[in-house]
């Protein structure tokens, strides 16, 4: 009897596992089939080219999920890079193939016949996608722009007026961004004359043994008052306890549900930090966002800057802090993913207000995750100059 009950349960688990395995291959199949259909088959290119392109698309459709999984397990090397690169390429091909239907419609209305219409559309889509990917790769891997912004803070003391908070976030040091890239970022940071330098999470994608040499240059970054680090969700995929310990060994203060106080004479500013919202379910003992603990013992009446990786953490901080600094969204990174991000987060990038007291600054991030492209979502290093609130503002 027990065996009879166990067999259906075992079959149910097998079916669930099969479905989980099938979904990535189904998605990959759609991403490859649509461009092949509209860019190769519909334009009636020579039969040999159509068949060859179809065979390549089929191999890539099956290979992409395998590359992504094997590359993630390996962590370094060609396999770790190949999957994300091709994912970015085929995603943009898929998106702009769909968008190309508008051009196809315009050409049809203006009387352009097929197969000329289909071929013109295919060439336009391929050319536009190639140019966009080249620009997106430069945006992701090239120089990181500095974005400066003044933020008016209620109750900021006159001695703290003009305090410079420099934010770097979502560096995602992995198979693409080398130690040289980190060194270049640190050189930029040192030129920005930070009073408070913060990293708001998602430092790396990988274990300490594989990535420490890429992170090490952050130990040379300088700031007048403090260098502060908080966890993002990716720390909990990569060994949060190891990475927080390593950042402390580099001289950074890790704010895990606690705060520091920046003083100029008798004027004070509280800078608090909390764990990422995923920390409590990560399985890492003692980790979990706790704003009450972060603010415990803070000087009464002093303005508060909160470091919280995800913008949506502002919902628990409204009217308890004056300014929250977050990352996580990457500004969408690959258009049109930004629209999906907005379903989960209150904002994509920039400064926003939440309640009468609280402002939120969301950085687009300094690095990138996955595909080494940034399409309509440039990276940034944010320089926020804190100013006393204007009368009546």
Each language-model region and where it sits:
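Juxtamembrane/interfacial segments around transmembrane helices
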Residues: 102-111, 137-148, 171-187, 217
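Non-catalytic terminal accessory segments
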Residues: 1-142
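Canonical alpha-helical transmembrane segment with a positive-inside/aromatic-interface signature
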Residues: 116-161, 165-167, 173-178
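Soluble catalytic domains of enzymes that build or remodel membrane lipids, polysaccharides, and related
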Residues: 152-393
């Amino acid at each position: 009897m027990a065996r009879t009950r166990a067999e259906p349960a075992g079959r149910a688990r097998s079916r669930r596992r099969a479905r989980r395995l099938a979904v990535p291959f189904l998605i990959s199949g759609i991403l490859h089939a649509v461009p092949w259909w509209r860019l190769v088959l519909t334009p009636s290119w020579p039969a040999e080219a159509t068949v060859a392109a179809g065979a390549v698309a089929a191999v890539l459709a099956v290979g992409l999920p395998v590359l992504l999984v094997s590359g993630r397990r390996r962590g370094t090397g060609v396999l770790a890079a190949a999957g994300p690169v091709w994912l970015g390429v085929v995603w943009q091909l898929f998106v702009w193939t769909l968008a190309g239907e508008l051009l196809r419609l315009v050409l049809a209305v203006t009387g352009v016949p097929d197969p000329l219409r289909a071929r013109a559309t295919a060439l336009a889509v391929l050319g536009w996608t190639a140019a966009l990917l080249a620009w997106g790769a430069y945006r992701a891997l090239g120089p990181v722009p500095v974005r400066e912004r003044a933020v008016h803070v209620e109750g900021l003391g006159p001695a703290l007026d003009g305090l410079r908070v420099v934010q770097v976030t979502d560096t995602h040091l992995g198979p693409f961004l080398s130690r040289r890239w980190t060194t270049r970022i640190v050189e930029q940071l040192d030129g920005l004359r930070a009073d408070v330098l913060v990293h708001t999470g998602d430092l790396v994608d990988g274990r300490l043994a594989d990535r420490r040499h890429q992170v090490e240059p952050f130990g040379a970054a300088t700031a007048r008052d403090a260098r502060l680090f908080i966890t993002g969700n990716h720390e909990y995929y990569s060994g949060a306890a190891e990475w927080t310990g390593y950042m402390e060994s580099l001289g950074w203060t890790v704010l895990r549900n606690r705060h520091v106080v920046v003083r100029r004479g008798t004027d004070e500013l509280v800078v608090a930090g909390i764990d990422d919202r995923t920390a409590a379910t990560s399985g890492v003992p003692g980790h979990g966002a706790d704003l009450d603990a972060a603010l415990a013992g803070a000087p009464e009446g002093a303005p508060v800057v909160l470091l919280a990786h995800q913008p949506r953490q502002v919902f628990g901080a409204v009217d308890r802090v004056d300014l929250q600094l977050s990352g996580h969204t990457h500004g969408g990174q690959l258009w049109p993913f930004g629209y999906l991000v907005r379903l989960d987060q209150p904002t994509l990038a920039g400064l926003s207000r939440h309640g009468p007291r609280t402002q939120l600054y969301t950085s687009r991030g300094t690095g990138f995750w996955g595909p080494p492209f940034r399409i309509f979502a440039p990276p940034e290093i944010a320089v926020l100059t804190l100013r006393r609130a204007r009368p009546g503002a």
